[in-house]
From Swiss-Prot:
The gene is ndhM. The keyword Magnesium does not apply. GO terms for cellular component: plasma membrane-derived thylakoid membrane. NDH-1 shuttles electrons from an unknown electron donor, via FMN and iron-sulfur (Fe-S) centers, to quinones in the respiratory and/or the photosynthetic chain. The immediate electron acceptor for the enzyme in this species is believed to be plastoquinone. Couples the redox reaction to proton translocation, and thus conserves the redox energy in a proton gradient. Cyanobacterial NDH-1 also plays a role in inorganic carbon-concentration. Its main location: membrane. One of its GO terms (molecular function) is oxidoreductase activity, acting on NAD(P)H, quinone or similar compound as acceptor. NDH-1 can be composed of about 15 different subunits; different subcomplexes with different compositions have been identified which probably have different functions. It is a peripheral membrane protein. It holds the Pfam family NdhM. Keywords: Membrane, NAD, NADP, Plastoquinone, Quinone, Thylakoid, Translocase, Transport. This is NAD(P)H-quinone oxidoreductase subunit M. Belongs to the complex I NdhM subunit family. It is an enzyme of class 7 (translocase).
């Protein structure tokens, strides 16, 4: 396998086969780096970040015996994206009112008026 960084990029999740050194991605086939919500669309509590990180570890551990490929990395990213949507729907996560753009990419906020 070449020293090409594998990556998965979704709206709210970025995963790389790399480590971060001096704000640069350095290829490391034995390491996955997770970047959650790079555009700061959501307001995150420490607990909600931990839930996403724990689920990420669970998905990576499940994949551990298989070869890492673009497909498997995209699958992990898609499952994390769905998990973030669930956190938002369950009220454990909210949109960031100070976000650069308010586009409600995962649906309108759930408020009493809309329920």
């Amino acid at each position: 396998m070449s020293n090409t960084i594998l990556k998965c990029t979704t709206r709210h999740v970025r995963i790389f086969t790399a480590v971060v050194e001096n704000n640069d991605l350095i290829f490391d086939n034995g390491h996955l780096t997770l970047d959650i919500d790079p555009d700061n669309e959501f307001s995150w509590s420490d607990q909600s970040i931990k839930k996403v990180q724990d689920y990420f570890r669970e998905l990576v551990d499940f994949q551990a015996d298989n070869e890492l490929s673009d497909y498997s990395l995209r699958k992990i990213g898609s499952l994390l994206e769905d998990f973030i949507r669930k956190l938002l729907k369950d009220g454990e996560l909210s949109y960031n009112p100070n976000s650069r753009v308010m586009n409600y990419s995962m649906g309108l906020p759930r408020t009493q008026e809309l329920l």
